[in-house]
Every structure is written in structure tokens, then in C-alpha cells.
Amino acid sequence: CNGVLDELTLDDIKSIFKPKFIKQLKAMQLCGNHGDPIVARDTLEVLQYFREHNPDMWLSMNTNAGAKDDFWWYSLAQTLGQNGRVIFSVDGLEDTNHLYRQNVQWKIVERSFHAFIEGGGRARWDFLVFDFNEHQIEEARAKAKQWGVEEFVVKKSSRFITGHTSEKKES
């Protein structure tokens, strides 16, 4: 072992979160600050473990939806049920999403949305606005409605403001 913890496995989760502890939880959010939750090996099994021990808790997850097969997404929807949702962080359409969500293929994103919603999943689409995708907001909103996405959220980004400098003034 190199001493680096890359991800928590289902066995790790079971040793940390005992059923008695899980029963008193109201919610759990997998947000992906250190990587997308869907690339962790045991994400679905971990969520199933939490659901098994607390059918009423709210379970949610943020993802770019760029991985896993249809069966996985359908199973995730079944696991979350009505007491959970997936927040799909998708920043554009086929020709722009990959500009910020690098290496994410649109066809996989679209397939993931469909399989999850067909499985009964509750979906929210978070759309970060950049210069390269702002012209697509209304088209994406319409697509979200057509697909059965419950909520479409537009988020302004200040990540790449042109002309912004952080130079220090000399005294």
C-alpha cells in the first residue's frame, strides 16, 4: 500500500458506517469534489447499502454522466427511488459540453440521462454558463423538458473571466 486512499470501497463504507448510524441519517450527498462519484468502483453498491439500512433518507449525487452503461443508470434510479436524485452537471450540448467537461462524450451523457429517467429516476440538470455555451441555454432547457428532467438550473460561472488579473499593487 502506498498510503494513498484513492476511493472508499463498499467494505470501507461498511466498516465506517454501521447500520445503526445509517438509520438516523436524513440525507447523504455524493458531490464529486475530488472526482466524479460514478468512476468509483462501488458507488452503486454503496448507495444500495445506505438505502437498505435507511429507506427514507434522501440520497443524491452530482455527476457529469460521462461513464457507466444503461443498466447501471437504470439500477441507480431504482435504488434512489423517489427519495433521491441525480444532479447532472452538463455544460452545453453535443458540440460544447466537452469543452469544460473534458473527455466526456455527449452520446454517453445522453444515454445516461435516458436510462436514469426511464428507470424512474429524478433528474436535475445543472448548466454552467460560459462564453462558448451561453447561446445554448434555451435549447438545453427544451431538451431537458423533452427528456423528463425535473429541474433545469442555469449557473453563471466566473471561472474564466477575461481581463481579470490578480496582480499586487506595489506600495
Where are these predicted regions, by residue range?
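N-terminal pre-core extensions flanking Radical SAM catalytic domains
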Residues: C1-V4, K23-Q24, K168-S171
